[in-house]
Amino acid sequence: MTASSGTPPHQTVERARELREQLGTAQHEYYVLDRPTLSDQEYDRLFRELQGIEAEYPTLCTEDSPTRRVGAPVQSAFSPHRHLVRMLSLDNAFDLSELEDFEQSLKRVVGDAIHTSGYTVELKIDGAAVALTYREGVLVTAATRGDGTDGEDVTANVRTIRGVPLRLHGDNHPPLMEVRGEVYLPFAGFERMNEARVAAGEPVYVNPRNAAAGSMRQLDSANTAARPLRFFGYAAVLPDGSAPARSQWELLEQLSAWGVPVAPHRQRCHTIQEAEAWATVVEHETRATLGFAIDGGVVKVNDMALQDELGIRADRTPRWGVARKFAPDMALTKLRRIDVNVGRTGVLTPFAVLEPVDVGGATVTFASLHNADQIAAKDLREGDTVQVVRAGDVIPYVLGPVPEQRDGSQQPWSMPTQCPRCNTPVERYGDDVAVYCPNVACPGRQLEGLVHFSSKDALDIDGLSYARIQQLLDAGLVHDVADLFDITVDQLTSLERFAKKSAENLVAAIAAAKQQPLSRLMFGLGIRHVGAQAAQLLSRQYGSLDALMNATAEQLGAVRGIGSIIAQSVASYFADPTTRALMERLRARGLRFDEPNAVQADGVLTGATVVLTGTLPSLSRGEATALVEQAGGRVTSSVSKKTTFVVAGEEAGSKLDKAKELGVTVLTEAELLEKLSGASADASADASA
């Protein structure tokens, strides 16, 4: 599109402003609130529309436009940047005793005032520190920590991180301020990035922290934009060294209100013992569920006035804070051998058999190796000394070998050419990195398929453990999922270690699983590419298994949130005569083939576009969205002339103002529920007539 040198029409100016607002709101909901209301497809459509407007009228491309995140080549090497105030590093504490020593050092300066203040405790993100300078609420500079006084200007790269606000929300921000935080890579994104590097023949990153730091120093920010980086803020300073808040807790709340992502699981603690209790829970329970790396917690004096009074030590560490470090989440051990597991779809997955080693407080004997390409890229050999990581990951994985410790006895490894469970020649499809066993009767595939079918997110069959399923397979009692529903108490009690009560409980649990809704059955079938969310979307849209089985790939792909790959996979699965025979066997055994929360084709909100804003009295955002969608409506994130109505709660803000301005109907939660219950009453009356 050729750029226009003329003045853009008023409606185009307004549309560009509206798009920037919609996309900014969507990014805030996704990256900060973790409550997205705009689908990826809708976001991409709006993004492309804004790109088109800005290409035609370059004067409409503002500094805070979401399109400015895409990335552009840096013209020269990184320039030095002087921080507004020196970035400090915290001292460390490794247990309660050292935290108590820290508190005693505080009391020597401020006495018992520390008890009035208390502490704010936060996660210590294992990433790359950056400082973001905002002038009049607009991001103007981003820099690395450097030596604490001077860092490197990485503005072009940081602008590509969607969680970093290009313009702060609200209008109560200082004229000039530096927001500090950590750029990090979630574990899932780190794995995807390394897989892409393997496919491209590039060396893999050793850990997420190194990957985040390396991403900040890309000379072409388009490379940074392609990486799934995230950001958490933890501090803000003004030019005079003060903070724009009276307490650390208030500062974190203010950062969040400005649209800056803040790490979860922060807490106010009245005593240092409470801070240690928090750290213990985070280290041994929370850490494994986070999905990103942390290497400890941070304990800070909450009162900012006391922080100022405490000041810094001669070694340039602040007296008012300390890092409560956790046990290392990486360890070295011996890679005894590499074995291969066969998954439910036939994928052969190599895994490491290790000499037992303590990693992050747990003994690790097995670890993930992902696929043969990654093993080759890392040059892993049986007998190697390897680095094993468990941080934040339920399944430990091998980062790489320690080549310096090789003595010549280590042996290279290659993927077997035959399935280790059934000896069928393996196959590799196109450019897929995975290797498959094509035999649907493979014992390995049968075992993993049954385990998945009975898992918690599928039919949730209590008592049907991995070992029990293996026992049933070995006894010839089951070969596929339909066979489970033919098992009797007498058959089970004839097996070893199966008491009558246990057998009765398992048969009862299998019978109860017949009443699970279609969405759980769909997920349990183990259709390639179909996760729990996709299964739920399809089941709610079609309402019955028969309707799903008869849908074409094109029809399935039209369901919001279902892409062409999933649609084709589902259509191909149900087109297979073997699958259809299995479905009839399940039907004959009384399984439920309908979805109770299916979208109503003629629902009261069919065709309606609804916006939810503010805090509703009793419904969460997710619950309200589900009710609207079940009634046939669609929930969007922004108000326009096409909006049917807005449901407003407390602190509704700009969306409510926009609705009133456009004359869009505004409902309370009670009015929404009345509208929905009225539809239910009408339906009941029709049914009884």
UniProtKB/Swiss-Prot annotation:
One of its GO terms (cellular component) is cytosol. Residues 600-689 form the BRCT domain. SMART domains: BRCT, HhH1, LIGANc. Zn(2+) binds at residues 419, 422, 437, 442. Keywords: DNA damage, DNA repair, DNA replication, Ligase, Magnesium, Manganese, Metal-binding, NAD, Zinc. It is an enzyme of class 6 (ligase). It catalyses: NAD(+) + (deoxyribonucleotide)n-3'-hydroxyl + 5'-phospho-(deoxyribonucleotide)m = (deoxyribonucleotide)n+m + AMP + beta-nicotinamide D-nucleotide. One of its GO terms (molecular function) is DNA binding. DNA ligase that catalyzes the formation of phosphodiester linkages between 5'-phosphoryl and 3'-hydroxyl groups in double-stranded DNA using NAD as a coenzyme and as the energy source for the reaction. It is essential for DNA replication and repair of damaged DNA. Its EC number is 6.5.1.2. NAD(+) binds at residues 40-44, 89-90, 122, 145, 182, 300, 325. The active site is at residue 124. It comes from Gemmatimonas aurantiaca (strain DSM 14586 / JCM 11422 / NBRC 100505 / T-27). This is DNA ligase. GO terms for biological process: DNA repair; DNA replication. Belongs to the NAD-dependent DNA ligase family. LigA subfamily. It comes from the Bacteria. InterPro entries: BRCT_dom, BRCT_dom_sf, DisA/LigA_HHH, DNA_ligase, DNA_ligase_AS, DNA_ligase_CS, DNAligase_adenylation, DNAligase_N. SUPFAM superfamilies: BRCT domain, DNA ligase/mRNA capping enzyme, catalytic domain, Nucleic acid-binding proteins, RuvA domain 2-like. Its cofactor is Mg(2+); Mn(2+).
